[in-house]
Amino acid sequence: MISNKKSYAMKMLQLALALSLLHYNPDYLLHRWDSQLELGTHGDGWELEMLRTVHRLDMDHNPYGNRKGLSPRIEDLLNFDDPSLGGMANGIGGCKLPPRFNGSTFVMNLHNTTGNSSVQTAALQDVQSTSAAATGGTMVVGTGGAPTSGGQTSGSALGEIHIDTASLDPGNANHSPLHPTSELDTFLTPHALQDQRSIWEQNLADLYDYNDLSLQTSPYANLPLKDGQPQPSNSSHLDLSLAALLHGFTGGSGAPLSTAALNDSTPHPRNLGSVTNNSAGRSDDGEESLYLGRLFGEDEDEDYEGELIGGVANACEVEGLTTDEPFGSNCFANEVEIGDDEEESEIAEVLYKQDVDLGFSLDQEAIINASYASGNSAATNVKSKPEDETKSSDPSISESSGFKDTDVNAENEASAASVDDIEKLKALEELQQDKDKNNENQLEDITNEWNGIPFTIDNETGEYIRLPLDELLNDVLKLSEFPLQDDLSNDPVASTSQAAAAFNENQAQRIVSETGEDLLSGEGISSKQNRNEAKNKDNDPEKADGDSFSVSDFEELQNSVGSPLFDLDEDAKKELDEMLQSAVPSYHHPHPHHGHPHAHPHSHHHASMHHAHAHHAAAAAAAHQRAVQQANYGGGVGVGVGVGVGVGSGTGSAFQRQPAAGGFHHGHHQGRMPRLNRSVSMERLQDFATYFSPIPSMVGGVSDMSPYPHHYPGYSYQASPSNGAPGTPGQHGQYGSGANATLQPPPPPPPPHHAAMLHHPNAALGDICPTGQPHYGHNLGSAVTSSMHLTNSSHEADGAAAAAAAYKVEHDLMYYGNTSSDINQTDGFINSIFTDEDLHLMDMNESFCRMVDNSTSNNSSVLGLPSSGHVSNGSGSSAQLGAGNPHGNQANGASGGVGSMSGSAVGAGATGMTADLLASGGAGAQGGADRLDASSDSAVSSMGSERVPSLSDGEWGEGSDSAQDYHQGKYGGPYDFSYNNNSRLSTATRQPPVAQKKHQLYGKRDPHKQTPSALPPTAPPAAATAVQSQSIKYEYDAGYASSGMASGGISEPGAMGPALSKDYHHHQPYGMGASGSAFSGDYTVRPSPRTSQDLVQLNHTYSLPQGSGSLPRPQARDKKPLVATKTASKGASAGNSSSVGGNSSNLEEEHLTRDEKRARSLNIPISVPDIINLPMDEFNERLSKYDLSENQLSLIRDIRRRGKNKVAAQNCRKRKLDQILTLEDEVNAVVKRKTQLNQDRDHLESERKRISNKFAMLHRHVFQYLRDPEGNPCSPADYSLQQAADGSVYLLPREKSEGNNTATAASNAVSSASGGSLNGHVPTQAPMHSHQSHGMQAQHVVGGMSQQQQQQSRLPPHLQQQHHLQSQQQQPGGQQQQQHRKE
């Protein structure tokens, strides 16, 4: 995957460089090229496929011709001589130039080549003057906002000169003489042109210029970068503005307006901030122009522009940028715009104004920010544009007054209040709605295949790497993992580049300042969110209706989108969409979208972007989370619709684009797994059965899917009322019931990918995750895993139901819900089906195990069949999924997770509990004790709080030594539930490692440990209550009431809130704690010790990425601590970890061994290592230095004794091991010897046979030539060859008498032959007896030898041993033949 990415990056880079060398406008070429490229839908990873040959006229006819086998050729891109281009180029007959191109390309090339800004300036002037003079076209080089012909061009400080060839066309009515170049001077000012960017940034910029980075609207914009660092929402390079993308798809804008600066420092040419105007009107441009226009987010069509503006403005709003801020003429004053028509001028002006409004300044930094925000500003511009149009296009307005949308109640940035934002959003929404009718056209217009294609920039090489889906997902997980910290710099969209990072920080500041309010409201919901919600309220009716974005709309949108991305097959689309969903910080802003995804199309569209911005704050995150929950989950119309629409929350959004079809699999799963999203558990069960190869592929092979939740938990199959519209079934908020989601401070948004979504189809779990789980392990797998684990259905959110349900560590993926904890853990579906032995035999995949786990505890429906009421109310958990409660969650969520969560009433919000982590405070979470067997676990470990991995924890499946144990954060955040995290056995869960059968481990609670419901729900260990913030072990005691937990009411035994790891607290920008939301940031709610379910955790880490243990492991646990941990878990963990503060101390203690702790408690002055390791003399000397009490001395001696014993034991074990190894070696040697001897024997056998066969062949050969006295061939049956001692060979007749066998005859012959010698006569073989009755005489065949017969040594006739065979046959004629044969 990486290689593919790099390869792609290299190709693009080479192409960009080649184009640069050719001084050809890469925007044009790449534009055309990009439009022809698509993610490979048939290969591994994302590979570009030439969907079409170069964009030629023929492309128009067969736009999707697949040139997959052919690599793009520059010749294809450079159609200078292609006459068709001339016709296409804005109707400029012989013109080979694209309708417009970026003059800065040339400048850039010159500048880069010469490094002399002056040269660049000259070149620029040259180009400008030449083009202006030659064509008389309107090449507007505007700087500073000085009015140009259109009065609306703003120069880009970076010198983006967009030359519109169409405008240059003499026939172009709009062409106007070049305006004074005073602006050019500004534009060309060396400082502006100086490369103040790193090479990497420059490369990015170049790529952007080449349109190589089609980030402009990538749905993946907010995906975390490869290094796991969240990109800033407008992250320069990855800024695929979802706002724009989604907006465009929703029809909000035909072109992806949210442009992403390649670098924070480099405005993207397509940014509206640096507007490139299409020179020719749409009509003139023809398809290609439209193509380019859309690519650049520009379209002459006024409606289109208005829509774009609205969309962009919305995106801007979403981003949290106040459109009020003057987009600063200063910002992009330097941008050179060559615009030929009024509309474009207006757009430019609007953009300019927006730049001013956004407070962009001309200085490089400002420009960088501006470019970064340009997408936002663009959005603002868009919305302002219509207004702008209404106003005089005089730039002065924008500059002097800081143009403000009339619709939007403009306030100064400082005063931009939630009300202002709300109104702005409303205005934007209105604009969009007004433009909805145009959306269809816009969608048609959207032809940039690259829109929404995610790429990342290699931090090391600066290469642009197209992200493979897996990578995206990982990134998403990373996002989810991205700390929800208050500091926005951790914004999920944080760029990997320093500039981006800086920008993010600025942005965070900006967000706060711009919004003029703390991102987090007291509730923990960002004010913006509140504003959004207010707006949502306004929009709710629409939301409820699904308004303009209905599933059908979504489908239409999908269909209308021409981008190859959207030409993908359904599965691919689904996968992309889901991926997008996960990628987009899932929490699309909570705003209005909850009710209807489209509530603010822009919001969703920009959900990622704007999320990053608007909700940078934790509150924002929370809001997003909520919004996302609603938008994603609830946002969709109903679950089915919601799924399709909700996620996207914008019809156009990628999410919406996903087919509303039944559940989604995580996007990643969409393609690879058949959808198990059946809404009904039974169906899933069927699916499960289908995929149930004991699990390796449990459901598509959890292991296979492990990286991804089966469904977005957010999309839990059950819809929960979206927050926005409680009534709306919108899937249960990803975090919990949508109903409370809105009201309650959203739990911290789940990791961007919605922990809930990932974790649990039932968001409830996800909810929990989200809360604590903003971070997943960096790798997707971890996230998924954690999601799976997270979602054991048993999140609190799952509500008590989940609680009742066995704690379902697993994601509902397979077992869609453990709905009831009532059932004995072992009662689970799988358990029912298989005996323990069978399970043992099974390949317990994590997924399978999880299934088992789920099933075991409750509903036999691993699949989430409702085993108990749980399903029925769908309270938050699998039940929601299965049991056909499409909205089970919603029901729960709406009702607050009402329903008997497996018999325990989940307080309102119980479902939501998880969802909102019980933000609603639904106590219902108490769900059955069963739910958390963990509770018993907790009790056992007592540590829920102190997440000291008990030995069992680490040793257990994973050997807690593993670094993973110590670094839960490595792959996952506190919520990382990947298998690897030992924390999965959070201390609480960390029950002594029961020698459970592995399968039990996986899927089940340890039967030994607890009966699922055996513990009273209220029995959570006290420690459990204490939150161990450090690990989120979702150890919920069954009794923990989710609500208590949510509020940090760890006090409530039932609180199921995951304990966040300390880290987590830092991350909860979502304000878990900050918001004071039900979940205290700490979720003090007890992290209830993980249940065995947690355990389910899967002590096997095989399928998950390392560190993805189902529970996050404590951040830094040393193995030593194992012992200490045990102790800690027993005691301190319970108390200390319960409180966040306690957690930190616990963490410290976790690393301490029991002896260390005791020594510390007794204030022993000698360190434990010294006590153990010092030589006796030195040790005694040290002891003598201190006045130690008897207790201290006793402890010191004990410590030393234990330490020495430990060493001795280790040595003993080592010796034993050495002996074993030695014996093993000896045994191996013996075996080897035996093998060798056998081989030798076999070889000898084979040789013997070979020789025997060879001799037999010789014997036969000789007989063929022998003749009897009559000249007849001798038959071996009648004659035998005998060899004498001297080597002579005799042919002797065999005795035929019955009494004698050949051997006897031969023997007799020998004896007789030995008789005598008859001169010249062959001795008569009288002795031969009657055997030789033939009277045949043995012929002495040795020629030349004396007639005396030598004594013959007779050999068996076959003469097998004979080496020399001399045979002489005496022919009747007395002729002698002597034959010597040697083997």
UniProtKB/Swiss-Prot annotation:
Show the segment(s) annotated as Basic motif: 1197-1234
Q: Per the record, where are the segments of Low complexity compositional bias?
A: 867-878, 935-945, 1128-1146, 1299-1320, 1346-1383
Comp. bias regions, Polar residues? 260-281, 978-990
- Where is composition skewed (Basic residues) in this entry? 588-616
State the function annotated in the UniProt record. Answer: Plays a role in posterior cephalic patterning. Probable subunit of a heterodimeric regulatory protein involved in the control of head morphogenesis. Isoform B may have a repressive effect on Dfd response elements, thereby modifying the activity and specificity of the Hox system and moving the body anterior/posterior axis.
Could you tell me where the Basic and acidic residues compositional bias lies? Answer: 530-546, 1148-1157
Compartment(s) of residence: Nucleus
Tell me which domain of life the UniProt entry assigns to the organism this sequence originates from.
Eukaryota
Recorded protein name is: Segmentation protein cap'n'collar
Organs and tissues of expression: Embryonic expression of isoform B is localized to the mandibular segment and the hypopharyngeal and labral primordia first detectable in late blastoderm stages. Embryonic expression of isoforms B and C is ubiquitous.
Q: Species name for this entry?
A: Drosophila melanogaster
Pfam families in UniProt: bZIP_Maf
GO BP terms: blastoderm segmentation; dendrite morphogenesis; determination of adult lifespan; head development; insect pharynx development; intestinal stem cell homeostasis; negative regulation of reactive oxygen species metabolic process; oocyte dorsal/ventral axis specification
Q: What are the bZIP domain coordinates in residue numbering?
A: 1195-1258
Q: Where is this region: Disordered?
A: 258-286, 376-421, 516-549, 585-626, 717-758, 860-897, 923-1026, 1102-1157, 1297-1383
State the GO CC annotations: nucleus; polytene chromosome puff
Family statement: Belongs to the bZIP family. CNC subfamily.
| Region called Leucine-zipper, residue ranges | 1237-1258
